[in-house]
Amino acid sequence: MDPRERVPPGNSDEETIGEAFDWLERTITELNRVAVNHLPRELIFQVWQRCWAYWREEQGMSSSYTKYRYLLLMQKAMFVHYTKGCRCLQEGHGPGGWRSGPPPPPPPGLA
């Protein structure tokens, strides 16, 4: 066996992959918790639906890849929001964005 192909002790391929999927789930959950205080829930839900429709249904990618693409888009949205001068906590638009009424359901399995 080539030493470059050896897996370090305590890190089998399955554990490494499982850890990556766990990290992805934790990161998306935390991002959603923060995002609902800064972005409208409708926007978050629409981004999730669009990612799922395009990456999962149209392109046939895995659900993990779809979640990864959702994570990238939401990180960009939060970055733009912060760079434009976030005043959410000062103005207090509250959780769920600016629209009144009951919020739509959160992205499936993510919040």
UniProtKB/Swiss-Prot annotation:
It is found in: Virion; Host nucleus. Keywords: AIDS, Host nucleus, Host-virus interaction, Inhibition of host innate immune response by virus, Viral immunoevasion, Virion. GO terms for cellular component: host cell nucleus; virion component. One of its GO terms (biological process) is viral life cycle. Coiled coil: none annotated. A motif (Nuclear localization signal) lies at residues 64-71. It comes from the Viruses. Residues 60-79 are annotated as: Binds to human NUP153. Its main location: virion. InterPro entries: Lentiviral_Vpx_assoc_factor, RetroV_VpR/X. Plays a role in nuclear translocation of the viral pre-integration complex (PIC), thus is required for the virus to infect non-dividing cells. Targets specific host proteins for degradation by the 26S proteasome. Acts by associating with the cellular CUL4A-DDB1 E3 ligase complex through direct interaction with host VPRPB/DCAF-1. This change in the E3 ligase substrate specificity results in the degradation of host SAMHD1. In turn, SAMHD1 depletion allows viral replication in host myeloid cells by preventing SAMHD1-mediated hydrolysis of intracellular dNTPs necessary for reverse transcription. Belongs to the lentivirus VPX protein family. Interacts with the P6 region of unprocessed GAG. Interacts with host VPRBP/DCAF1, leading to change substrate specificity of the CUL4A-DDB1 E3 ligase complex. Interacts with host NUP153. This is Protein Vpx. It comes from Human immunodeficiency virus type 2 subtype B (isolate UC1). The lineage of its organism: Viruses, Riboviria, Pararnavirae, Artverviricota, Revtraviricetes.
